[in-house]
Amino acid sequence: MTSARLSIIPEFLEKISLLGYDNIFSVNKSEVVNLKNKSDILFRGIKTSAGNQTASLKSLTGVSNWVLDEAEELIDENIFDTIDLSIREKNIQNRIILVLNPVTKDNWIYERFFEGKGIEAGFNGVKDNVCYIHSTYLDNKENLSESFLERVEAIKHNNYKKYAQKLLGQWLDRAEGVVFESWSIGEFNPDDLQTSCGMDFGF
């Protein structure tokens, strides 16, 4: 759980401090305890290459909210379903929260929650018991450095497709590099160089 200790937990501590709730929570490297109502926030990793971690997550009891950070990196939809079905506390609202940066449209999250439900990129609202919240750097410009915003403008000017995906949260039609881009038609072999031909059968 190195990633949680280095990124998620420090950010959580920062936010509870801003809210003035430092005395309400007890924090260690893998767990946050609310001292008032005794509820826990647990931090766990998902190992997609081995079943042990998923099995241990499935066996967790009393969990009513599950937040999957960097959800686009979870390749196996079956792992999501396994844990999703374990969030089933009675007489309480259960929530599954996916936090992600959109990647390509062949990702199962896009196919299941966007294409499958007729949801356009950038949608904010509720459909079929799913709440969509789309945010970008534009919602937080007042907290971003001038140097960062200058880099963003450079990307926007030089590579709008990258800007749209990385910074506006749009889904890519295909993986980068699959097909050449920014090409033009010109004279073939103007320097009369030796020509060789080959064929890629695609496997």
Name the predicted role of every residue range.
Residues E73-N143, S147-K156:
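ASCE P-loop NTPase helicase motor core
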Residues A4-S64:
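Inter-Walker segment of RecA-like/P-loop motor cores
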Residues N65-W66, I97, S196:
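Hydrophobic "anchor" residues on beta-strands that sit immediately upstream
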Residues N140-F201:
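ATPase catalytic-site recognition across NTP-hydrolyzing enzymes
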Residues K36, F201-F203:
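A generic beta-sheet turn/junction motif
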Residues M1-A4, I92-Q93:
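Conserved SF1/SF2 helicase motif Ia
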